[in-house]
């Protein structure tokens, strides 16, 4: 590789054969290869990772050590951090902005997949699939129908959406095809935008009190942390089900366990948890009225290749002096010398 190429750091928890880099990151390098090379940083501690990326021109991440303010302050040449997911909670966005570093994500690669998964969780909870599966396996063939005879049909039920970004919009379309009424709360999206999609904009209190099913789609940050805790659950229907395919810490897990145990709400469908992987004794894994999947909502044959290509394209754009397609910290623009070449609005963020 040419020595004048930009250097992009990516975390590797073990020493790897440098000759395999071109193969291992072939999809990212489709866009990056003319301008940059990928350098694997074998680090076992945050300090080792910080030392390894100190002189890099960019970083690609989606897991591993958090790129916090302390690490960002040590970066001498970094101009871009490419995140290979929708959520960007592994990066201190404010610190990156102060340092003049562009942060990109991939907000529109696996929208449909996550919306499918959210709807699957909703349907599974609505039809009590965990219980139905157990009854079938245990030979209780005639016990399921009497139980479901007390369950209202999905048509006419209300789905509430917490945040109204790309995934929420796709979930709304799916829910409406089942005859559900859809409401949404998002203080960062205009009511006209929400209502234009046939979705009713509501306040947070109305979202809680009216939803039969409540699907969580917000990014995780200081503002949204533990948005659903004891107070929120107390305002929900005792027949309500909460679904989370966004980020675990949006829900106060301890409060959720109590709410489910005390029948404050009826159930939950969770693809994400506060601690991942969870401990084996986490009560949520063993509750009859809870469906849990291991953070796989976006997983399909298409997801990883397209995500990797998109990260490579975003980082390559910045290294070429151009504004990326998806910047989660657009207020960094005055601090960088980038050509804003495309008509994307400047208010694009991690949930759009």
Where are these regions (language model features)?
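Adenosine-phosphate binding glycine-rich loop
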Residues: 287-309
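N-terminal glycine-/charge-rich "phosphate-binding" loop or analogous flexible N-terminal tail
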Residues: 1-56, 319, 335-336, 340-352
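Internal hydrophobic alpha-helix adjacent to the cofactor/substrate pocket in enzyme cavities
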Residues: 306-325
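Rossmann-like adenosine-cofactor binding region
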Residues: 67-71, 187-283, 299
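Rossmann-like dinucleotide/phosphate-binding beta-alpha-beta segment
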Residues: 3-4, 34, 147-238, 346-352
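Phosphate-binding beta-alpha-beta segment of Rossmann-like dinucleotide-binding domains, i.e.
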Residues: 99, 107-158, 170-173, 324-330
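Short beta->alpha connector loops at strand-helix junctions that form conserved
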Residues: 84-85, 101-112, 186, 204-205, ...
């Amino acid at each position: 590789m040419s020595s004048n190429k930009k250097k992009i750091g990516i975390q590797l928890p073990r020493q790897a054969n440098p000759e395999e880099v071109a193969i291992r990151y072939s999809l990212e390098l489709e866009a990056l290869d003319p301008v940059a090379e990928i350098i694997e940083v074998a680090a076992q501690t945050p300090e080792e990772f910080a030392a390894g990326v100190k002189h890099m021109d960019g970083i690609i991440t989606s897991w591993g050590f958090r790129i916090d303010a302390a690490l960002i302050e040590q970066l001498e040449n970094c101009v871009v951090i490419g995140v290979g997911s929708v959520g960007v909670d592994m990066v201190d966005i404010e610190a990156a902005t102060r340092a003049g570093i562009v942060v990109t994500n991939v907000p529109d690669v696996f929208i449909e997949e996550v919306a499918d998964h959210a709807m699957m969780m909703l349907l599974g909870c609505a039809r009590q699939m965990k219980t139905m599966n157990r009854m079938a396996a245990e030979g209780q063939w005639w016990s399921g129908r009497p139980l479901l005879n007390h369950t209202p049909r999905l048509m006419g039920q209300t789905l509430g959406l917490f945040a109204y970004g790309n995934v929420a919009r796709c979930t709304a379309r799916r829910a409406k095809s089942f005859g559900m009424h859809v409401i949404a709360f998002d203080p960062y999206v205009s009511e006209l935008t929400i209502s234009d999609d046939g979705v009713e904009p509501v306040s947070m209190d109305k979202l809680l009190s009216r939803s039969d099913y409540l699907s969580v789609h917000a990014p995780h940050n200081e503002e949204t942390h533990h948005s659903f805790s004891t107070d929120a659950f107390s305002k929900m229907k005792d027949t309500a089900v909460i679904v989370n395919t966004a980020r675990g810490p949006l829900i106060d897990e301890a409060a959720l366990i109590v709410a489910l145990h005390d029948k404050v709400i009826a159930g939950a469908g969770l693809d994400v948890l506060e601690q991942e992987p969870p401990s084996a004794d986490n009560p949520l894994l063993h509750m009859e009225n809870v469906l849990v999947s291991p953070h796989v909502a976006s997983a399909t044959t298409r997801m990883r290749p397209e995500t990797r290509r998109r990260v490579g394209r975003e980082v390559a754009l910045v290294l070429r002096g151009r504004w990326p397609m998806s910047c989660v910290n657009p207020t960094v623009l005055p601090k960088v010398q980038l050509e804003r070449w495309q008509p994307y609005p400047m208010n694009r963020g991690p949930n759009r």
